Amino acid sequence: MLTLALPKGRLAEESIDLMISKGWLSAKPDPDSKELIYNDPLGKIRILLVRSQDVATYVEQCAADAGISGWDVLKEGGYDLATPLDLGIGKCRLSLAAPEGYTLEARHRKIRVATKYPNLAREFFFHKGLSCEIFKLYGSIELAPLVGLSDCIVDLVSTGGTLKANGLKELNIILESSARLVFNRSSLYGKRKEAAEFMDSLSKI
């Protein structure tokens, strides 16, 4: 049996649907249940439901054999994990956005940036040769430039609807993201038969 860490929310739902279609799960966990561990009757997969930012930590520390996490989260955290498979679900992009009329150029002061992704944001501005001040926020990132907290934001974008609704414009795409299957190296070796079968099955989408 493989223990799989999944992020709560839409990505978990997409991942579970995929595993059901591939015969690794027999049914969806009860949506009304408060339990965070789901043992599927087929006995192939045990699911841990965790915060999206915590999936990689559970896998890296061997509390789970594998996990499904966004590429944005994995790149931001710099985890030591095997990332053998892009599942092609949960697609979005990490972008720089700012109010209409804002241009990205060298200024007399640091560019103020609000984001949940300080490492990726800092790396982007470094490669642009621009100095920045990062404000790490945990939600409602689009609000920051509207109230003067920041000049711009670095955040995930799916359709761009939220940006448009708040008068923001996408300036640069920093990273294309999608859901990745990740393994800790111990499980990838110790459970290599199950891991190989799981990866092979999910790769045939």
UniProtKB/Swiss-Prot annotation:
Protein name, as recorded: ATP phosphoribosyltransferase
Keywords: Amino-acid biosynthesis, ATP-binding, Cytoplasm, Glycosyltransferase, Histidine biosynthesis, Nucleotide-binding, Transferase
GO biological process, one term: L-histidine biosynthetic process
EC number assigned by the record: 2.4.2.17
PROSITE patterns (UniProt xref): ATP_P_PHORIBOSYLTR
Function statement: Catalyzes the condensation of ATP and 5-phosphoribose 1-diphosphate to form N'-(5'-phosphoribosyl)-ATP (PR-ATP). Has a crucial role in the pathway because the rate of histidine biosynthesis seems to be controlled primarily by regulation of HisG enzymatic activity.
One protein family per Pfam: HisG
Transferase recorded as keyword: yes
Domain writeup: Lacks the C-terminal regulatory region which is replaced by HisZ.
Alphabetical list of SUPFAM superfamilies matching this protein: Periplasmic binding protein-like II (SSF53850)
Enzyme class, UniProt record, top EC level: transferase
GO-annotated cellular components: cytoplasm
Domain of life: Bacteria
Protein location: Cytoplasm
Catalytic reaction annotation: 1-(5-phospho-beta-D-ribosyl)-ATP + diphosphate = 5-phospho-alpha-D-ribose 1-diphosphate + ATP
Family: Belongs to the ATP phosphoribosyltransferase family. Short subfamily.
NCBIfam families: hisG
Signal sequence annotation: none
Keyword Amino-acid biosynthesis: yes
Biological or metabolic pathway of the protein: Amino-acid biosynthesis; L-histidine biosynthesis; L-histidine from 5-phospho-alpha-D-ribose 1-diphosphate: step 1/9
